[in-house]
Design a protein with these regions (language model features):
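Glycine-rich nucleotide phosphate-binding loop and flanking beta-alpha elements
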Residues: 35, 52, 102
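Redox-cofactor binding/interface segments in oxidoreductases and associated redox assembly factors
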Residues: 45-46, 96
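Residues that form generic nucleotide/phosphate-binding pockets
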Residues: 7, 11, 69, 85
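S-adenosyl-L-methionine
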Residues: 1-43
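Conserved Class I SAM-dependent methyltransferase catalytic core
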Residues: 78-124
């Protein structure tokens, strides 16, 4: 998203005096396309937006703004398709954050880490 990139870049530029941001490189690209071109990844951490539900809609006010920005730029949230693309990247491990009751993207999970409302599916 060009808008999100601009907002993040502006925030980073305003925080230049903080050491952690000095080594941060922000790239404006589709994450899946970029991951397929890049060759230096060992691990991918995939944290797709959770599907909307009545229960979590009230708690995700700030994320709703991000969803609106993506809709304005006609960027679709398709985590299943993104997972398929990211699965083709030659990496050692992929960690996928999912709602605890959500179906996994693939049945080839090597192991899982469970929390109260979230789980992490790990593919090796």
């Amino acid at each position: 998203s060009k808008i999100l990139f601009f907002l993040l870049n502006d925030g980073i530029n305003r925080s230049n005096n903080q050491e952690i941001f000095k080594s941060l490189t922000l790239i404006n690209a589709n994450a899946c396309s970029y991951a397929l071109r890049a060759t230096k990844f060992d691990i991918i951490y995939f944290d797709p937006m959770y599907p909307s539900s009545k229960k979590n809609a009230l708690n995700s006010g700030k994320l709703e703004y991000i969803a609106r920005i993506l809709a304005t730029e006609s960027i679709n949230n398709n985590p299943t398709q993104d997972f398929k693309v990211l699965s083709k990247v030659p990496i050692k491990k992929m960690i996928v954050k999912r709602p605890i009751k959500a179906e996994p993207f693939s049945q080839t999970i090597n192991y899982q880490v469970h929390g109260k409302t979230t789980r992490f599916d790990i593919y090796i």
